[in-house]
Regions:
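Ligand-binding beta-strand-loop-alpha-helix segment within the catalytic cores
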Residues: 44-117
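Glycine-rich N-terminal segment of FAD-binding domains in flavoprotein oxidoreductases
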Residues: 14-41
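Short beta-strand segments
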Residues: 21-25, 53, 90, 117-120, ...
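A glycine-rich beta-strand to alpha-helix segment
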Residues: 17-18, 27, 31, 105-133
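Class I SAM-dependent methyltransferase SAM-binding "motif I" and its flanking Rossmann-like core
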Residues: 123, 127-171
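Short, small-residue-biased leader/transition segments that mark boundaries at the very start
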Residues: 1-7
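A glycine- and small-aliphatic-rich helix-loop capping segment at beta-alpha/alpha-beta transitions
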Residues: 34-45, 68-70, 131-140, 199-201
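ATP/nucleoside-binding phosphotransfer catalytic cores, i.e., glycine-rich phosphate-binding loops
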Residues: 169-172, 176-225
Length: 225
């Protein structure tokens, strides 16, 4: 990933940054730490990189420790030289009567993603595209399933405090990326990885839609294989 950004940085003009789609959670932490390490060693600069984050809880303030905004800054963005104006993260504080308009605007701003980094959930979701998500879905406000909220509830100190909704890039938005890296670690992901990679394409396993992408790499550890 770092090498790819360095190569593109040499051929892109400043008006055309390398556009990186990012996710949060445990899955990409190792990658982010490696990119930060390479940055501190002088191997990579992020000044010609723009990032678009995949999703955010709703409603939530960016200063709350459980927010995607807070986490991606703490885990990655605060440790590199990316320009603040090149950071794009869904806003979890948009008034409810403006959410649809905001989501359409965010989706429109994601005109080009050079590389999308994503993980896969235990139910086959990507971002907050839960089972049942439409293949042509765009950035939108979604209802979180009970299972997703239960998984997230530890961070929110109880299910009753866990948001019931989220803003997420849609399947179609993700599929527009020029290249996708899908990552999964651990034995608990082995079953869903098999369905994503070898199973039928179905809305019940949203990540299975990625089989139709022309330039995707699946990176897993031995336990998830």
């Amino acid at each position: 990933v770092g090498s790819e950004m360095c190569i593109r940085d040499r051929v892109y003009e400043e008006s055309q940054p390398f556009v990186l789609g990012l996710t949060t959670g445990r899955t990409p932490l190792g990658l982010y730490r490696e990119l930060v390490k390479r940055h501190h060693e002088g191997q990579i600069s992020f000044r010609n990189v723009a990032v678009y984050s995949l999703d955010e809880f709703y409603p939530i303030r960016s200063t709350e420790r459980q927010s995607r905004n807070y986490r991606i800054h703490e885990e990655f963005l605060n440790h590199i030289d990316i320009l603040p104006e090149n950071v794009h993260i869904p806003d979890g504080t948009v008034p409810e009567d403006r959410v649809s308009e905001y989501c359409a605007s965010y989706d429109h701003s994601v005109r080009r993603i050079d590389l999308m980094i994503i993980g896969v959930g235990e139910d086959g979701q990507i971002g907050f595209n839960e089972p049942g998500s439409y293949s042509r879905s765009r950035t939108r406000l979604v209802q979180l399933t009970y299972n997703t909220r239960k998984i997230q509830s530890g961070a929110f100190f109880g299910l009753e405090n866990t948001p019931k909704m989220a803003v997420t890039m849609g399947i179609d938005t993700i599929m527009r990326a020029n290249r996708i890296i899908l990552m999964a670690w651990g034995e608990e992901k082995a079953h869903i990885v098999q369905r994503v990679v070898e199973g039928e394409i179905t809305d019940q396993v949203p990540a299975s839609y990625l089989q139709a992408h022309q330039n995707i790499e699946v990176v897993i550890d031995e336990n998830a294989a």
